[in-house]
């Protein structure tokens, strides 16, 4: 499982003209599910995202996790995180899990993040084309990968 985690002042996602999710200060997380991922990877990634200490404490050091700041999380599925363009210019996505296998793991990650965060998580719409907007804070952007063997 791979996540691109961005500290934001605000973020939103839209699909079509009628569906919209947004947060204020917090984390925008783009989440990709790889071939072979299981609920173990979803749980590990969920804990890691919520526990990341990337918000400033009173001394101005990155020392606080999102849950200690009252911040929110916007979680957006993104299968292209496992795109491979090492040969040619058109990326292949064979490293991404199939739609039917990835969706339950994405949903597991949503539930697990909500449990660890202690409040609802805003999400995009799995498998749909979306428009994502954000105002970075810092900017602070991290790329997380689950360990090879859990």
UniProtKB/Swiss-Prot annotation:
RNA-binding is among the record's keywords: yes
Keyword Metal-binding: no
UniProt record, GO biological process: D-amino acid catabolic process
Motif Gly-cisPro motif, important for rejection of L-amino acids, residue range(s) on this chain: 138-139
Main location: cytoplasm
Pfam families the UniProt entry points to: Tyr_Deacylase (PF02580)
Keyword set, alphabetical order: Cytoplasm, Hydrolase, RNA-binding, tRNA-binding
Sequence similarity: Belongs to the DTD family.
InterPro entries, A to Z: Daa-tRNA_deacyls_DTD, DTD-like_sf
Protein name per Swiss-Prot or TrEMBL: D-aminoacyl-tRNA deacylase
Subcellular location: Cytoplasm
Enzyme Commission number(s) from the entry: 3.1.1.96
Family matches, as NCBIfam families: D-aminoacyl-tRNA deacylase
Disulfide-bond pairs as recorded: none
Annotated catalysed reactions: glycyl-tRNA(Ala) + H2O = tRNA(Ala) + glycine + H(+); a D-aminoacyl-tRNA + H2O = a tRNA + a D-alpha-amino acid + H(+)
Subunit structure: Homodimer.
PANTHER family attached to this UniProt entry: D-AMINOACYL-TRNA DEACYLASE 1, D-TYROSYL-TRNA TYR DEACYLASE
GO molecular function: D-tyrosyl-tRNA(Tyr) deacylase activity; Gly-tRNA(Ala) deacylase activity; Ser(Gly)-tRNA(Ala) hydrolase activity; tRNA binding
GO CC annotation terms, alphabetical: cytoplasm
Domain comment, as recorded: A Gly-cisPro motif from one monomer fits into the active site of the other monomer to allow specific chiral rejection of L-amino acids.
